[in-house]
Design a protein with these regions (language model features):
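Conserved C-terminal "switch" segment of AAA+ ATPases
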Residues: 99-171, 198-202, 206, 227-229, ...
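C-terminal engagement/docking regions of AAA+ P-loop ATPases
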Residues: 164-248
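Short, small-residue-biased leader/transition segments that mark boundaries at the very start
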Residues: 1-3
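Conserved RecA-like P-loop NTPase ATPase core
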Residues: 8, 36, 49, 76, ...
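Conserved AAA+/SF3 P-loop NTPase catalytic/coupling segment centered on the Walker-B
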Residues: 27-54, 68, 83-92, 104-112
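AAA+/SF3 P-loop NTPase mechanochemical coupling elements
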Residues: 21-31, 60-77, 88-97
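Short glycine-rich substrate-engagement loop in P-loop NTPases that contacts/grips substrate
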Residues: 5-32
Length: 248
């Protein structure tokens, strides 16, 4: 991760040859941006990157530049070592569509990792998609049919994170500090559509919503001190909600 917000978005550099200031674009001007251990970046860096994610543009000096399409950000953070980190505010975390938890590799996978590192094997990575193909795929995903009953199911799930007592989940009321925002509903719908697309269906079914619910919601639910004291996780809360909310 860059040490300065100017390193991320870019800055104005003085050219002695031309005696003018020229724009030097930062690494954010890419189709795919990897922000490694984002919670170790200072707040100003996080803010610069997340603003770029939201606005799809950055301002350098007096000029505003559109970011390339598609623009995707993958951020990582180490959940174990938290010393010297800068936790992302809830409003910024909410801008990430998904939070995917990566566990230890499986036995065969770890053997492959050892083999590649010991032998010095280089991965032969070949592109399988072009940028314009991803853009076209996104258009198709947005055409996947989302029935009103599925819409209500999505909204009910998100509302249950805010008002669990209204969904016969009174035991969660004191466990949830805050629930999902409207972005949670939007991204749950988009992720369900994407999952249906991957499954080669032109319509969303409840199983699509359930399949992506944990990844969409786990970082959007704030736990109370009582929940943390009880060792309850946001994943467990999502599971309880999915088991309780009526499936269409």
């Amino acid at each position: 991760m860059c040490s300065s917000d100017l390193d991320v978005i870019g800055t104005m550099v003085y050219s002695q040859k031309d005696e003018t200031f020229q724009v030097k674009r930062g690494p954010v001007f890419a189709n795919f941006v990897l922000a490694d251990e984002i919670n170790r970046a200072p707040a100003k860096v996080q803010s610069a990157l997340l603003e770029a994610m939201q606005e799809r543009q950055v301002t350098i000096g007096k000029e505003t530049f559109k970011l390339p399409e598609p623009f995707l950000v993958l951020a990582t953070q180490n959940p174990i070592e938290q010393e010297g980190t800068y936790p992302l505010p809830e409003a910024q975390v909410d801008r990430f569509m998904l939070k995917v938890v990566i566990d230890y590799p499986k036995l065969e996978e770890e053997k492959l990792i050892i083999r590649q590192n010991i032998n010095g094997d280089k991965l032969n990575v070949k592109p399988i998609l072009k940028a314009d193909e991803i853009i076209e795929a996104r258009k198709v995903v947005r055409q996947v049919y989302l029935d009103e009953k599925i819409e209500k199911y999505i909204v009910d799930i998100v509302f249950a994170t805010r008002y669990p007592e209204k969904y016969d989940l009174k035991e969660l009321k004191d466990m949830i500090g805050f629930g999902g925002s409207p972005r949670a509903s939007i991204n749950l719908a988009l992720a369900a559509r994407s999952y249906a697309f991957i499954k080669r269906r032109g319509y969303v079914i409840p199983e699509d919503v359930r399949a992506v619910a944990h990844d969409v919601l786990r970082h959007r639910i704030g736990l109370t001190y009582e929940a943390e004291a009880s060792n309850m996780t946001s994943d467990e809360i999502v599971s309880k909600i999915l088991n309780k909310v009526e499936v269409p």
